[in-house]
A protein has these predicted regions:
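Nucleic-acid endonuclease domains
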Residues: 1-31, 36, 44-190
């Protein structure tokens, strides 16, 4: 997970818990949901553009199986999605600082180097653009898959330890129907 996502998850969970109660969310398999009140929620951060400035509207959600299990238990799964414009580490200074902070090269990085795969661009900062809070039922997800605003993602991709990743789903945040949106705020969110 990138630092932006980690930071927003931690801050949001603390704020939600202190203002409206709730706890850390449950785990289903390897997937831990970030927050639980009446329903199960996950907090996401979504970069609105890639390192080349190309717009990105598809936000990666969770493990498909974990979402299904949460829906079976709670009936609704919610997502708190922060969209942001990233600052990319073009100079490599952020990566260098982070590598020094880690102290040693991770196994994932060693494997990447063996494959001669390029190191991905790091995000060194961001500006929050919007907050979108959505809730989805099983029926909403099925409808979204039929209509194309929810899709499968990451078949064949790998985790940091080299193991295969579980299938996730993505959502086109600009196509989510109004009946699934609880809050939509921006661009002057903060």
């Amino acid at each position: 997970m990138e630092w932006i996502g980690w930071f927003l998850e931690e801050e949001s969970r603390m704020l939600l818990s202190s203002k409206i109660g709730g706890t850390k969310g449950p785990s289903f398999g390897n997937t831990a949901f970030d927050y639980k009140n009446k329903y199960v929620w996950d907090i996401k951060s979504h970069s609105v553009e890639d390192k080349n400035g190309v717009s990105k509207t598809e936000c990666i959600l969770n493990d498909e199986e974990a979402i299904d299990r949460a829906l079976n238990e709670y009936g609704v799964v919610g997502f708190v999605i922060y969209t942001y414009k990233p600052d990319y580490d073009i100079s490599g200074d952020f990566k260098k600082w982070h590598d020094e902070l880690k102290g040693e090269i991770s196994e994932y990085e060693k494997e990447r180097m063996k494959r001669n795969a390029p190191s991905r661009s790091r995000k060194s900062g961001c500006v929050i653009k919007s907050l979108i809070i959505i809730k989805l039922t099983k029926e909403d997800i099925e409808k979204g898959q039929r209509e194309g605003w929810i899709k499968d993602f990451q078949k064949g991709m790998r985790n940091a330890d080299g193991s295969p990743r579980r299938n996730k789903i993505t959502i086109k945040i600009d196509k989510v129907p109004a009946n699934c949106i609880i809050v939509k705020s921006g661009p002057n969110l903060f």
